[in-house]
């Protein structure tokens, strides 16, 4: 077999050589005393940080030498990079209450040089603040929707799986697909239960000594959404999983699994107040489905963008609460912020004409 490698070599002050292997793994390794030590994989950059220089570059060990700046110094630095301000006093208030680095996540959208952080002509600090407040309201809207879906899914998983496999099915390795994941899940469940301060958990342990975890209807009320997702996906009873999926008007449990995995990642972003409006998500929902309810034409939908996940949330909410106003709230928010470029969120041109949104 013929293959090729391109190596980037740089030296450190200690004489070590860092080699970046271009083709094979995308990982770096260090050559020291004729021994090659593999280091961690270089993480991918956010979409708005795509480099304009050649992809092949030198990686060096560097010391971080930047000092903290006061608000006036931050404004001076941003001005030197080409950023404009409509109200500098208000800008200082924003930095004091939101922090520069959080706003910088939105300023990067306006950069023309990601290495030197130079901004497009006629870019104002307030432009980034505008997107920040839109993103903040959007996060609140999505988080509320996910709460309803999470509570519903917990209830259905607890009820239907327990009826088929008993109150401690999550501790039965015969019901899992992957034994290693089963062990990890059980360890996580026990840890989450032990640290819970809920009265019903404390009361359970005062009354019962065996098994060492409460039944599923208590346990799954104090475990994380991520743990719930892993338990459901690792369950080997496809009949029960399909039964639950059909309660959400989904034809296959694999579709529900793919949606839940995406929603867990989205929820974590929301819980940590992370930017979501133009994020590319690593987990993508299955969109080409034979839906029983009103759905979308997914032909031109980018599954790694937020619009795809918003559609999944809307569809699930319609099955849980048919009279919900989630879609109305989404439209109202977009109307409130007309200058937001919704294409960066993955919205297609005809999204409002899709059956789901009509």
Predicted regions and their residues:
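Acidic/aromatic/glycine-rich contiguous surface patches that form carbohydrate-binding/processing clefts
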Residues: 273
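Extended intrinsically disordered or low-complexity regions, especially N/C-terminal cytosolic tails and loops
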Residues: 12, 27-265, 277-358
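Compositionally biased, low-complexity peptide segments typical
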Residues: 20-26
């Amino acid at each position: 077999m013929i293959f090729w490698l391109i190596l980037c070599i740089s030296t450190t002050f200690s004489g070590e050589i860092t080699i970046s292997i271009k083709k094979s793994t995308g990982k770096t390794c260090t050559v020291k005393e004729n021994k090659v030590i593999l280091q961690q994989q270089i993480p991918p950059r956010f979409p708005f940080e795509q480099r304009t220089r050649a992809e092949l570059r030198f990686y060096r060990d560097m010391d971080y030498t930047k000092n903290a700046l006061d608000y006036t110094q931050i404004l001076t630095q941003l001005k030197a990079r080409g950023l404009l301000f409509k109200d500098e006093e208000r800008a200082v208030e924003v930095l004091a209450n939101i922090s520069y680095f959080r706003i910088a996540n939105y300023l990067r959208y306006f950069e023309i040089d990601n290495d030197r952080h130079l901004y497009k002509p006629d870019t104002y600090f307030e432009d980034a603040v505008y997107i920040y407040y839109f993103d903040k309201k959007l996060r609140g809207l999505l988080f509320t929707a996910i709460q309803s879906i999470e509570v519903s899914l917990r209830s259905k998983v607890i009820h239907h799986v327990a009826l088929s496999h008993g109150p401690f099915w999550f501790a039965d390795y015969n019901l899992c697909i992957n034994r290693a994941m089963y062990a990890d899940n059980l360890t996580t469940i026990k840890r989450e239960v032990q640290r819970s301060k809920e009265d019903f958990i404390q009361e359970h342990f005062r009354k019962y000594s065996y098994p060492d975890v409460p039944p599923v209807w208590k346990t799954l009320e104090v475990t994380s959404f991520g743990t719930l997702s892993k338990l459901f996906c690792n369950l080997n009873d496809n009949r029960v999983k399909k039964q639950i999926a059909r309660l959400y008007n989904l034809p296959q449990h694999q579709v529900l699994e793919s949606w839940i995995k995406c929603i867990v990642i989205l929820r974590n972003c929301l819980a940590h107040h992370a930017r979501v409006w133009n994020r590319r998500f690593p987990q993508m929902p299955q969109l080409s489905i034979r839906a029983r309810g009103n759905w979308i034409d997914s032909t031109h939908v980018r599954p790694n963008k937020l619009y795809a996940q918003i559609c999944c949330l809307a569809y699930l909410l319609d099955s849980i609460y048919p009279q919900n106003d989630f879609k109305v709230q989404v439209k109202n928010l977009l109307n409130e912020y007309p200058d937001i470029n919704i294409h960066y969120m993955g919205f297609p041109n005809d999204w409002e004409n899709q059956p789901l949104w009509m």
